Structures are given as C-alpha cells and as structure tokens.
UniProtKB/Swiss-Prot annotation:
Enzyme kind, highest EC tier: ligase
Name recorded for this polypeptide: Isoleucine--tRNA ligase
Cofactor or coenzyme needed: Zn(2+)
Modified residues (N6-acetyllysine): K183
GO BP of this protein: isoleucyl-tRNA aminoacylation
Main location (coarse class): cytoplasm
Protein species of origin: Escherichia coli O139:H28 (strain E24377A / ETEC)
C-alpha cells in the first residue's frame, strides 16, 4: 500500500499548543525592556492625534492587590486599543508618596519625629521608604504586561512635582478660593490630624442614646406662647443625641420653623417635643400618662432661652433647616465646634464656635471639673451620670449606629473645630462652576454623573491643611498679630517653589524667613501645616500633565479609577482644576467596581478569600488575569475566584487554539507571492473574511465604548461559532488534500492570512503576551511589534448583490446545523461512525432547494459528508427528519456508498479506478498527479 501522507499539506507551526504563560511571559517582558518597546511605540505614533489617559497614582505602600491589577489592566487595554486606533497615547504611571500611612510605617520602625530623629531625618526616611515601595509595585505592574514609561514615572515626592503642587496652591489663592477658619473638621485623635472626607469610613458603633431636658429660663413666656396657664412643674425643651460628650460645647437648640411643637404634660413637669414625635418619645421614655396642653409652630419659639443642664449658662432656641422628624425629639442639640450643620447655623446666629477638646481627644483644662483631661469617648458615661444627678436625663439606652471612623486606624473620629485652611466652595463660586463642569464630562457608567453632582452639591468647604511631618508644605507666611497672609504671598510662594524644585520639601523647613522676607521677617511666622495628600494627587493635572513633554500641553482625556474615587481623586482633581483654571481636568471619567469573591463577598484576609495577582501570574500567567479583567463587566462588582479564573483559562485555550490553527495552516504561505485576489477566491473564503470584517466592526465599536467584556464575547463567538464550528471544519479537506499551490488552497490560505492579521490585533490590547507571540509566527514582512501598528485594513466581504451573499451562508449554517443533528443521532444509533460515512438527502422547498443546488457537488464539503443530494420537499420519505429551524427542510441519512479513500477519507465509488493510484479516489488522483481539483464555492 502506498503512503500518501507525504502528499498531504498537513498543518505545521512552531507556535506551541500550550501557552505555558507563567514560564514564557517573563522572557517576553525582558525582550520588551531590552528593545525599549514603549519607546518604539512612542516613536511610531509621533505626530498622531493624542489620547491621554492620566494615571491616578496608587499609594506607595504595600504590595499590589487584585484591585490594583484590575485598574492597571483596564488602563493598559485602553491605551493599547487607542494606539491601534491611530492615536499617540503616552502612558505615564504615577505614585502618591506623601501622607500618613507612610509616616505610620516609618514611625513603627524608627519612632515619631523628634524622638530618635529630627523632623528632617524623619522626612528622609519617609522618602526612602516610599521609593522602596514604588520599586516593588513597579515590578508587579510591569509583570502584568502594562506598557508605560516605567523608567520615568511621576512621583508626588519628585522635587519638581512638589514645587508644582505649591504653585497650584498659589494659583488657587490668587483666584480667591482660600480662607482660614476655626471650623469643625473630621479629626482623628490617633493621627492627631484633620482628615479629608475620602479618609473617612463608616462602621457600626454602640453609643449611649439620650433624651435630655433643657429647662426654660422664662417659664411664663413659654406658657404665653402655648396659650396655657395650668402647667404642673417646670417646662423643658428636650433634645436627643448619641454623642453625650459634645454637650459641654452646646451653644443652642435647633428646631424647625414649620414643624408643630407640642407642650406635653407628664408627671411633675412639661416637655416640648415635635408633635409628630410625641408618641414615639413617650414610648421611649416609658410614659403612658401624658396630655398635650397646646401646640405652636417652631418659628414661635425662636430665641427663647433654655438653661444648659450642667454648664451654668443658658442657650437660645434657633431655627434650622437640618432638623428632621426621622428620629429624636424634633429639637437638635447644637454644638458649632463639633458639627458642620451646627457650625453653619451657628455662624448665622453668631454663636461661639466652642471647642473644649484637644488634639489628643481629651477635654482641655477648665472645661468642667469631672471632665478635664478625660478622653471624649470615655466621657460619655460621666456626662450621662452628670445629667442624671442634675435631674435632666429623661432616658438613656445603648444604640448601634453607623459612625465615622479613620480609614487608617479604623477607630472612631470626632468633629473638632480647629484653625485650618480651607478651599471655599462658595466664596468665589467654586461649587457652581464645578457643577457646571461636571455636565461637560462623559461619565462611564453614566450614573457616575449624578453621584459626583450630589457630592459636590452637598460637600462642605475642603479642609486642605494637615498637621503632619511628611507632606508638601503650604508655604505660607502669616502676620504674627493679625494672622493675615503676607501681601506678597504669591510672589513668596514662587520663591519657595523654586527652592523646593532644587532641594525638595525640606527646603521649606530649612528656610530662614529672613532669606526672603528681609526686615519683615520678625513680623511674620511660617505656617507649619502641610497639604492634605489628596491635594497632591488632585493637582497632578497641573503638576504633571501640564508639564510632561510627552503630553505636549494637552489636557487629560480620561481618568479611570475605582468607584470610591468619586469622592476621592475625581473630586479633588475637579475642585483644584476648576479653582485654578475654571474647567474640569478630564473629558471622560470611567469607574470600575470592586473585586469580590465567587460568592459576592468582599475580599478579606480574615475570611481567607483574597486572590493574589502574583499567585495568578505565577500559576496561570498574566494573560489569564488580563482576560478575566476584560471579560468581566467592570461597571458592577467584579467576582474572582479559582473557579472563575479556570473559566478564563478555558476561554484562553479556545482563542489560542484558533490562532494556532491559522498559523499551522499558513505554513508555506508567502503573502507577497501566494495571495489570491478577492475576485478569484473561493466564495466561502470570501465569506470567512467578511465574517472577520463584521466581527472587527463590532470589536472596534466595543473598544471605542470601553465595553471590553463585549470585545471578549465577540472574539469568542468568532473563534467558536463562525470559525471553529463551521469554516475551519469545512476547509480542512481542501487545505490538506488540494494541490499545495492550487488556487483552491491558496484562496483558503489567503483568507486565513487576512483573518490572522485581524485576530492578532483584536487580541493585542487584552492578550498582549499571546498577541506578541502570534505576531512572531505570522508570515510576511512586518514591524517587530503588533503594538506599533493599527487595526488591520485588509478585510473585505461579500456584496449583498451576490447570489451567495452573507444571507446565503447564514442559511447554510442553519442547514449544516440541522444535518449535524441527524448525523449525531445516527452515530448514537451506531448507523455511522463519523460524518464522512454518511450521505444525506436534503428535501427542500423550491427557494431553499435552489440555494443548495447552486453549490453543486461542493455541497457535501459544506456538510462534511461523502454525499449530498437535493430533492423536492414533497418527495421526502416518512423517516426523513423535519427541521425545527427551517420549516422547508427535511433531512434523510444513509450510509455513503463506495469505498473509503485512505488519503481524503471520503467514501466514493471511484476509489481504485486509476491503475497507477489504485488505492485512492479520482479527486485525490487529480490532486496528487493531475492539475488538481477546482473549487468555486467551498
């Protein structure tokens, strides 16, 4: 028997079947670094229209977690897809390097500044620590396959950036947005510093819930207001609070002007409550026998005075819109030094902003004899006992409620009035302008707009000063007596910035005021405060984007971070940019959800459900992690687990196998010599290229809309359905058995070449390592890297006017599906072994029959059977299978007649008819020794 294997065009490629990504990717990274791939891309894209994705700086502390990976991979997908779309899209990664977490780490190792080290030495240690953290995180980010200017990232602790942060503050001051005030701010007693809103988290806390009676100073005036004379006992206005420790700072009681307030007689006294809350308060304080003596509007009680239960002074009733009927008594204890609403209304009524609490959270001397020096949270019980002793406590119980806590220490924080510097939201219209700017930004998902609008509309002034060691100095001089800013503040700040640009922030602390103030130095003091770390990152649109040469003066197109950044970086950047320039710093803002485990639970080391990106990369490879990120809808929570990553690996194998099939069948194909013109190609091959064209249109639209899970779904559909289960199956016969250089085979290879050229580019932004690997095996002259080019433009399709157009082949796909069902049943019934043992008769109604007949003898190749005939639908025998999909089709199957050709495996009746090749069929004889078969359709 002759060996005809050598006459077949069997697929062959060096592209491995197994990805072995964990082992192979590091070598690719080394090549990318050695070649300076990022630099090559920049050179290739020079002069193109720009797209700038400005990197929100992660904090330089600790190893990267799965959330970091999601963020950096999404950014990389966008930057690479923009490059392929014809943009110059430089990516400059950055790090946030100042602030409390780094101070705490350095304190743990070396002690607080001033203990073992000077403040200057402490700052140097902080700088060293931040630099080591940057290096560690950078290695992991690079390992993810993220391309960027890793050799020249921006660090908020770079001297030039520190100087530019000072300049940004100067611009804001010049535009009139800064003011100083003793104002209640979030204060962490462990940090001993003010906290930004973004540094506050909420946890459940148990607090005493108390109802307290403030006795009226002028009882008769109150009786007159309520038009009553017979009142048994004193009259009191009752407040409810869960922060008894703030009562020493009480300076008023707020009531609502339009609420009805009732005078209620209870045993031995009368109390004033919001009428709608009387019943619930009576239940709470355990009173069943009570009488409502009269009601008045809250406005009637304004400025009536009530005695503080233990502080020895009286306070007014004032009117406030912040009073609600949700809980309590309808009368709100008001301490302007301990709450933003209290402060605002206190300003309106000229109340004292009293703050009896020191930075360590203990009462200052002279507050009250039994409270001086006591921690405020320990003072709650003392205050409750005091109220009980004075007969002012109507009720006390423990209550669990959501309470603000420090993001770093996880401990409860307080509102505390301290002298601080603020960016005003309203004195120069910053709030109104910011709200206007928000409307001009594209928010992705679109609910982000309403979220940030609500935050901007309701946020207080931004406290930007901090009492810390490791941070950018505010660089201000204030008059010793008046505390007014120096009249030449902007000029002086620029002088400081120039010094910081050379020597870093230490230049400010080393600066002798005489050096720049001369004779005025003894009249002014240096402000010791540093800037809120959110000011550092929030000003990078100015300190980084505006000055980096690769951005060429262009503003950022996109900011992309987790959804917590609406109140964080998106907010601080918007505030600073609008205050400086009157406009938003971004054109688009994209947010992604948080990572959760496979059951939707928050990731937690204590639960043990965290997924380490380093482990995933070491086990499965970065491309699997990248594919998981891309295939997950980032607009909601992003679930990740070993099982979910395993599914991503399965999807990866499908894509890799498709790429390998294409490469293996392009063996021996030189596009410069072997390409077949579209008009000379087999129709099915043109259809396949058209499928790629349609897929590319969908994929590019999805990339443009940042719908990466749609990209992956469309890519998978193309690989699995249009290619895997149809086209690639059909062409194997022609590809393997036709003459090597025949039009029939070269047509097929031409289609595969076009498809591979497109596919490798679709993959590149997501499966960057695999795309680079595929690129190296593609035939033909090309640039060294897929990332320097653009989307493939060589695709074409069938015209709608052609008889065998896309609609024709769509119907053929359905016919093929119906035939497969019949074959599968026959195999199950042991009638045939494989599809080539079968011959089918398609009983079709005239319109479908005409289409099937048009393929002639090539119909069998489409159906993967050894025989295929078309007959009239009405002639179908009883055992023909009615199609459920195509009403005008019935399928009958029989065993194929003739012998099996050992070369093509088809059963035919002309096997052995040619003496010289007695074992093979006539078609194979033609392909081996003759002119080769001609294919027109399939």
């Amino acid at each position: 028997m002759s060996d005809y294997k050598s006459t077949l065009n069997l697929p062959e490629t060096g592209f491995p079947m197994r990805g072995d990504l964990a082992k192979r990717e590091p070598g690719m990274l080394a090549r990318w670094t050695d070649d300076d791939l990022y630099g090559i891309i920049r050179a290739a894209k020079k002069g193109k229209k720009t797209f700038i994705l400005h990197d929100g700086p992660p904090y330089a502390n600790g190893s990267i977690h799965i959330g970091h990976s999601v963020n950096k991979i999404l950014k990389d997908i966008i930057v690479k897809s923009k490059g392929l779309s014809g943009y110059d899209s430089p990516y400059v990664p950055g790090w946030d390097c100042h602030g409390l977490p780094i101070e705490l780490k350095v304190e743990q190792e070396y002690g607080k500044p001033g203990e073992k080290f000077t403040a200057a030495e402490f700052r140097a240690k902080c700088r060293e620590y931040a630099a080591t953290q940057v290096d560690g995180q950078r290695k992991d980010f690079i390992r993810l396959g993220v391309l960027g200017d890793w050799s020249h990232p921006y660090l908020t602790m770079d001297f030039k950036t520190e100087a530019n942060i000072i300049r940004a503050l100067g611009k804001i001051i010049g535009n009139g947005h800064l003011h100083k005030g003793a104002k209640p701010v979030h204060w962490c007693v462990d940090c001993r510093s003010a906290l930004a809103e973004a540094e506050v988290e909420y946890y459940d806390k148990t607090s005493p819930s108390i109802d307290v009676a403030f006795q009226a100073v002028d009882q008769d005036a109150l009786k007159a207001k309520f038009a009553v004379s017979n009142v048994n006992g004193p009259i009191s206005l009752v407040i409810w609070t869960t922060t008894p420790w703030t009562l020493p700072a009480n300076r008023a009681i707020s009531i609502a002007p339009d609420f009805d307030y009732a005078l209620v007689q209870i045993d031995g006294q009368a109390v004033i409550l919001a009428k709608d809350l009387v019943e619930s308060v009576m239940q709470r304080i355990g009173v069943t026998d009570y009488t409502i003596l009269g009601t008045v509007k809250g406005a009637e009680l304004e400025l009536l005075r009530f005695t503080h239960p233990f502080m020895g002074f009286d306070v007014p009733a004032i009117l406030g819109d912040h009073v609600t009927l949700d809980a309590g008594t309808g009368a709100v204890h008001t301490a302007p030094g301990h709450g933003p609403d209290d402060y605002v209304i206190g300003q309106k009524y000229g109340l004292e902003t009293a703050n009896p609490v020191g930075p360590d959270g203990t009462y200052l001397p002279g507050t009250y004899p039994t409270l001086d020096g006591v921690n405020v949270f320990k003072a709650n019980d003392i205050v409750v006992a005091l109220l009980q002793e004075k007969g002012a406590l109507l009720h006390v119980e423990k209550m669990q409620h959501s309470y603000p806590c420090c993001w770093r220490h996880k401990t409860p924080i307080i509102f505390r009035a301290t002298p601080q510097w603020f960016v005003s939201m309203d004195q120069k219209g910053l709030r109104a302008q910011s709200l206007k700017e928000i409307k001009g930004v594209q928010w992705i998902p679109d609910w982000g707009q309403a979220r940030i609008e609500s935050m901007v509309a309701n946020r207080p002034d931004w406290c930007i000063s901090r009492q810390r060691t490791w941070g950018v100095p505010m660089s201000l001089f204030v008059h010793k007596d008046t505390e007014e800013l120096h009249p030449r503040t902007l000029e002086l700040m620029e002088e400081v910035a120039k010094r910081v640009e050379v020597d870093g922030i230490q230049a400010w602390w080393d600066l002798d005021a005489k050096e720049i103030l001369g004779d005025e130095a003894d009249q002014y003091v240096k402000v010791p405060d540093t800037l809120d770390v959110w000011f550092d990152s929030g000003s990078t649109h100015s300190s980084v984007v505006d000055v980096r040469p690769e951005f060429a003066g262009h503003a950022a197109d996109m900011y992309l971070e987790g959804s917590d950044q609406h109140r964080g970086w998106f907010m601080s950047s918007l505030m600073i940019s609008t205050a400086m320039k009157g406009k938003a710093p971004y054109r688009q803002v994209l947010t992604h959800g948080f990572t959760v485990d496979g059951q939707g639970r928050k990731m937690s080391k204590s639960i043990g459900n965290t997924v380490s990106p380093q482990d995933v990369m070491n086990k499965l490879g970065a491309d699997i992690l990248r594919l998981w990120v891309a295939s997950t809808d980032y607009t909601g929570e992003m679930a990740v687990s070993d099982e979910i990553l395993k599914r991503a690996a399965d999807s990866y194998r499908r894509i890799r196998n498709t790429a390998r099939f294409l490469l293996a069948n392009l063996n021996g194909f030189d596009p410069a010599k072997d390409m077949v013109k579209p008009e000379e190609m087999v129709v099915l091959d043109r259809w396949a290229v058209g499928c790629a064209k349609a897929a590319q249109e969908d994929i590019l639209k999805a990339y443009e809309a940042y719908d990466f899970h749609e990209v992956v779904q469309r890519l998978m559909r193309f690989c699995s359905v249009e290619m895997g289960s149809f086209y690639l199956d059909i062409i194997k016969d022609r590809q393997y058995t036709a003459k090597a250089d025949s039009v029939a085979r070269r047509s097929c290879q031409t289609a595969l070449y076009h498809i591979a050229e497109a596919l490798v580019r679709w993959m590149a932004p997501i499966l960057s390592f695999t795309a680079d690997e595929v690129w190296g095996y593609l035939p033909g002259e090309r640039e060294k890297y897929v990332f320097t080019g653009e989307w493939y433009e060589g695709l074409f399709g069938l015209a709608d006017s052609e008889a065998m157009n896309d609609a024709f082949w769509d119907e053929l796909l359905k016919v093929r599906g119906e035939v497969n069902k019949v074959i599968e049943q026959a195999r199950a019934d042991k009638k045939v072994g494989g599809s080539l043992e079968a011959a089918v008769t398609l009983y079709a109604e005239p319109e479908l029959a005409a289409k099937l007949t048009a393929l002639g003898d090539e119909l069998r190749f489409v159906l993967l059977t050894s025989g295929a005939t078309v007959a009239d639908y009405n002639d179908a025998p009883a055992d023909a299978q009615q199609s459920e999909v195509l009403k005008g089709l019935k399928v009958a199957l029989s065993k194929a007649e003739g012998e099996k050709c050992p070369r093509c495996w088809h059963y035919t009746q002309d096997v052995g008819k040619v003496a010289e090749h007695a074992e093979i069929c006539g078609r194979c004889v033609s392909n081996v020794a003759g002119d080769g078969e001609k294919r027109k359709f399939a």
